Amino acid sequence: MSRFFANGSESESESSEEEIQATNFNKASAFQFSDDEEEVKRVVRSTKEKRYENLTSIIKTIRNHKKIKDIPNTLSSFEDLTRAYQKALPVISKEENGITPRFYIRCLAELEDFINEVWEDREGRKNLSKNNSKSLGTLRQKVRKYIKDFEDDLSRFREAPDQESEAEDEVVALESDGGDAGDDSDAGVKPTEAVPKAVKSAPAKAAPADDDDSDDSIDWDSDSESETESSDDENQYQNMRERFLKRTTEKEEKDDDKRKDKRKEQKTKIRKRAEDDEDGEWETVVKGHVVEKPKMFEKDAEIDVPLVLAKLLEIMSARGKKRTDRRLQIDLLFELRDISDQHNLGTAVSVKIHFNIISAIYDYNQKISEPMKLEHWALLLEVMQSMMKLLLANADIIMSESVAEEHEEYATSPFYVRGCPLAAVERLDDEFVKLLKECDPHSNDYVSRLKDEVNVVKTIELVLQYFERSGTNNERCRIYLRKIEHLYYKFDPEVLKKKRGELPATTSTSVDVMDKLCKFIYAKDDTDRIRTRAILAHIYHHAMHDNWFQARDLVLMSHLQDNIDAADPATRILYNRMMANLGLCAFRQGNVKDAHHCLVDLMVTGKPKELLAQGLLPQRQHERSAEQEKIEKQRQMPFHMHINLELLECVYLVSAMLLEIPYIAAHEFDARRRMISKTFYQQLRSSERQSLVGPPESMREHVVAAAKAMRCGNWQACANFIVNKKMNTKVWDLFYESDRVREMLTKFIKEESLRTYLFTYSNVYTSISIPSLAQMYELPVPKVHSIISKMIINEELMASLDDPSETVGMHRSEPSRLQALAMQFVDKVTNLVDVNEKVFDMKQGNFFQRGNMGNRGDRGYNRNQNNQGGNWLGQRRDRNNRNRNQRGHHKNNQDRQQQQQQQVQTIDEE
């Protein structure tokens, strides 16, 4: 019976209580733990420890495979290592600040040395199995490819391989804690035994093994102890979750301190033992296989020119081949040069070695699009200048690419050496541009790299002197162009001082140098590209120094604008730069219309930044591929050669304002007027559509506000918007002689505001005084007289001048504002009527004008001849009626137009 019934017997209640006790005992035993499971302390490891332990275990496996030369398993373990390192990268970047752990670099260095050792052992390679041999090649390729990202770390490690880092100490700690530190640990520490962890247990008394009673008693005692401990645990852990949480005790911290002390003691013991073994002498021990530097010559060899040339040929024969150590090749060439100089083998041999060193430095960087390293760049400049000084100092050495290798002469003068210093200096110049593009233009690195231009130009000058002494016209044109490209964009203030007479006429300026170089190219060049680039650079340089007429004449005589579309992209970029600078020059000289014509093609596209190769605009997804973007980035100009885009846009908008506003005022009611500048017109219209216009802030807003003021004839407000502190800082102060430019701008604003005022209010005045206009616009009276006379001559203003009274009489031949609006309204209504009539005809057709066309017999169902003849007569009658109706309609239109003209005349008379 169930124990929940109140009227049960005692036996039933006792049995039920026994059942309840049994169930309680079973539940408790389900969560009972042994002594070992309870007392073993749970260790929570960090992500760093887990990742590092995974790496060290794989590294240990790789070392074991290397010992037995199990190459296939080494390959698979290496792949596992790379994957494990990839997983550990977030931890390394967070904990180690992105620095690769030293034990990982040590593993890579040992693996590289192992592969080199096995690979160089040719006899051993022959005895390898097919699987081992295949795995060795695969492993070698993968390791060489993988360690390219760790070159700097590997080089630093090989310089001091015996140093230990904190990461290696942690790895040793992990191995010592886990008890699996091998003999070949990274830090060189001897393996230590695992320290057993303290376990709480009751002291058990020793007893003989063959005593059954004692065994029973011991078992009984252990059972009782477990029961008491389980009851204690149940009292201690009220929640089951607390049983599995890590317990932090002071003993754990003490264990960590003891472990650290043991490691320190082991290190000190090893250090003392090493000092005792060294007997007072220090020796650097390099781990792994050491690749010895090949000997240049035998010990007793007689060093002469043929031997050195043979060695040079041997070194350079490895050029471009796989598995060639390019750094070692450069070092060998320098050593060979020193040996040649020590034995006085001649300047020709030294020049030959110099040229091969330059070629080896160029070959070091396999990717042409990437810049070379700075150490190689400095070395290249030094070697290049040294070679050219040797060539200039020895006139009997002829170095040319036309000299065949079998015709080289090193024994007797004249010496013939095969090589092309022109190609070397051109590549040097290209590498300099790559270095500039790679640097951040706003950093100090860019400035330090830009200082190297002095040495680059000096090297170009040395090559130029050499080819002026012995070189063909084509070679001289090429080296002249290189010098021009370093000179054309630089401003020389001495040119303007010479113009003003502040310097003597015999002073040589950059304009004179450009004239000399460019005129030689014009006369001697056989290729169109060099001549075209020389003309463009010449125009650019003239425009930069305000030689407007010389620059304009060069453009007109060369007809560059007709053939530039067929040129290469670099030449087209130079053409765009030339047109931009020519527009700035025209603006500085007061030729506003010419400045607008020069800049309109650049600015109307909205992409002047790309056209001038000063940056890439963000494109949509499929407008530019990755390859196209890479090519366009290579064409970009260095930052110090950029033209200020805001200055260009401001000059363009101001020029458009000075041209467009008077034109709009003169053709205000002309429905067919054209736009001079579409970009400026759009800016003006967008500003007029705004309901609330605040004070101008940007450069464009200043120009638009000035244009609105000019439309009203308010020249002072217009000038204040164009010439103010903010605009001076952004734009006008960038000009040389900026005060002169600001004065010129103010003068043009006054003149164009006067013209706009006359166009706008000519129908208001019967006559107007010239002195009052001069006073209003602060212009001289002769200047106002000249402006009005020009307007009358060009039939822009219908007026006449009265010189005695100094007045302008308005003829008022043009319609008034009301008349012009009425005429516009008449034209629009007439057009609307014509359109409505056409729409009505299209909807109704000619159905009612064709007589009996609705009869089915007229459509061909009745076939007799009489009906056909009658139908023909009806069609003729209908055609006559249509002609009569059209004549009547035309007459009605004429009458309507006459009535409208009479109404307009009546309005005028009233």
Swiss-Prot record:
Molecular function GO labels: RNA binding; translation initiation factor activity; translation initiation factor binding
Any GO BP annotation: formation of cytoplasmic translation initiation complex
Domain PCI residues, every copy: 639-815
PROSITE patterns named in the record: PCI
Keyword Phosphoprotein listed: yes
Record keywords: Cytoplasm, Initiation factor, Phosphoprotein, Protein biosynthesis
Subunit annotation: Component of the eukaryotic translation initiation factor 3 (eIF-3) complex. The eIF-3 complex interacts with pix.
Protein name as catalogued: Eukaryotic translation initiation factor 3 subunit C
Organism from which the protein derives: Drosophila melanogaster
